[in-house]
């Protein structure tokens, strides 16, 4: 213990000494009027250079005499007397610089370059060549310090201390971790590919309110804020659904939105209070059309973003080139709890007994539909590894979905699961204004009974339905969970740049 404390004290002292030395260098730069120049322009990015010139031999590069200008962060440096090698990192990756005293202006190498630190941001100009080991490099004829880093790179002092630091100081994680940078590149590519797919399928992108007087569109506890000028409480949206369907009433027959939702709930490997969803609504369609659209979306995204319809996640492999599996909720329960008699799931007393045997705490306000849903979540959800649609959700837990024509106790709704996680939710929309008003009233009763996730009564939305919502289907997909899948990430914090964190004391 004493030795460990001593090492920690030594490391802290080393860091303090380095911080002091770097600030002293900045003082000198300020005195010379070259602390933070802003007149350097680059014309090349590392990955573009590698893609175009890695295959060329050094003789060909010398003959071409290609001069490039680059800029980035100095990650490594090997000083060998009058010459040095530097690894420069930019948005595209890394490229090596060859720096020779005799090729730079007088005094640059010894008086400036050798005093710079790892983490400093440099600008360099020179000709491309290959080293004896065949590495594409830039033979520098100009080298400038563009930004002085006052703190060392994280790996110099034993890397990032823990996972929490990666999330709190994401900038350090992105500097030091190639995998993290790649994860967020993939995320950006996923968002762009979704938009292309939606536009190609005739959808219009729209934006709806993030602050709402009445939160709706999902069963969740909202965040509350206050609008000073209007002197009213408002809610950060939990879903855009009701506004998007108002647009369908207004005549926009295919709409979608990609944006953040906010739910005042706990943090877990699958949950962040602020998260990104894509919701779409299309008129003259039902939930079966959504199933086809969802399969096409995932097939297109994986091919466009990853170059293959096959995705490896942990020790599982998913093939999005083929149709998803399909089970009803009751079929899934019986499959993963074989001792279940399906008829018992239609009997309140027997379903209650099953739930209690599974350790489910039943609330007084729950009916049969909610109990069966809880049984499903407890027995089957985590076992749905391969892409699977679960259908026939009870009306009790689906206040916005259309009732099934053959059985009014269930709805024309599905959720789909991949890797044991819910990824999306879709259904034929309820467009019967009177039925919707009745279900809102039931939600109000549930809220009065203590269910703080029950929905509010939205009178204006009922009025919109009274003007006529065409037969419509709607789908919501969690973008964060989708990106987790595509990047083989096992916690949602790894795919959100700045996840929610408890403030440091």
UniProtKB/Swiss-Prot annotation:
CDD domains: LysRS_core, LysRS_N
UniProt binding sites for Mg(2+) 1: 415, 422
Catalytic activity, reaction form: tRNA(Lys) + L-lysine + ATP = L-lysyl-tRNA(Lys) + AMP + diphosphate
First-listed, main subcellular location of the protein, grouped into a coarse class: cytoplasm
Subcellular location: Cytoplasm
Cofactor binding summary note: Binds 3 Mg(2+) ions per subunit.
Any one biological process term the GO annotation gives: lysyl-tRNA aminoacylation
Cofactor: Mg(2+)
List of residues binding Mg(2+) 2: 422
Family of the protein in this entry: Belongs to the class-II aminoacyl-tRNA synthetase family.
Record-linked HAMAP family: Lys_tRNA_synth_class2
Assembly description: Homodimer.
Name of the protein: Lysine--tRNA ligase
